[in-house]
């Protein structure tokens, strides 16, 4: 080592530097991630959502959810089997919920009620159309 300069040693054996960890934002979906959409749908129809849509069409599918059941379809959903575990893990990172409502206002209202009843502190809810 005698004749090597410090600069040469650092170039030959670079030391990884800790870099500032960039801030990340976690977005978590509701339907099928936190809430069990399929189970809720089957509760009212006895059918899988896709089978119901194939039989009654997309208009019949959304009519059942938005008109016949309404807000309660969304507000009374069960958690997905691992939904609470996921939420308990990510909540410390201040996640936002990202969800797609139906065209009817009952969906947005029902989802907001579900969040209010099930999540504390209340996360920001972003509706994506």
Residue spans for each PLM region:
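A general structural motif
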Residues: 21-23, 92-94, 122
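Short, flexible, glycine/charge-rich loop motifs used to bind or transfer phosphoryl groups or to couple energy/partner
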Residues: 15-17, 85-86, 127-129
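Substrate-recognition element of Asp-dependent hydrolases with the DxDx(T/V) motif
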Residues: 74-78, 83-111, 115
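Hydrophobic, Leu/Ile/Phe/Ala-enriched alpha-helical segments that form helix-helix packing faces
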Residues: 45, 90, 118-119
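Glycine-/proline-rich flexible loop or hinge segments
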Residues: 63-73, 96-97
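Active-site neighborhood of HAD-like aspartate-dependent phosphohydrolases
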Residues: 5-68
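Donor nucleotide-activated moiety binding/catalytic core segment of transferases
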Residues: 118-129
């Amino acid at each position: 080592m005698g004749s090597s300069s410090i600069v040469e040693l650092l170039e030959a054996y670079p030391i990884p530097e800790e870099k500032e960890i960039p801030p990340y934002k976690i977005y978590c979906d509701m339907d099928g991630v936190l809430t069990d959409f399929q189970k809720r749908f089957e509760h009212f129809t006895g059918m899988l959502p896709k089978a119901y849509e194939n039989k009654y069409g997309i208009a019949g599918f959304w009519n059942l959810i938005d008109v016949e059941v309404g807000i309660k379809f969304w507000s009374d959903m069960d958690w997905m089997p691992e939904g609470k575990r996921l939420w308990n893990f990510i909540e410390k990172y201040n996640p936002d919920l990202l969800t797609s409502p139906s065209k009817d206002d009952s969906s947005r209202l029902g989802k907001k009620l579900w969040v209010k009843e099930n999540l504390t502190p209340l996360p920001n809810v972003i509706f994506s159309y």
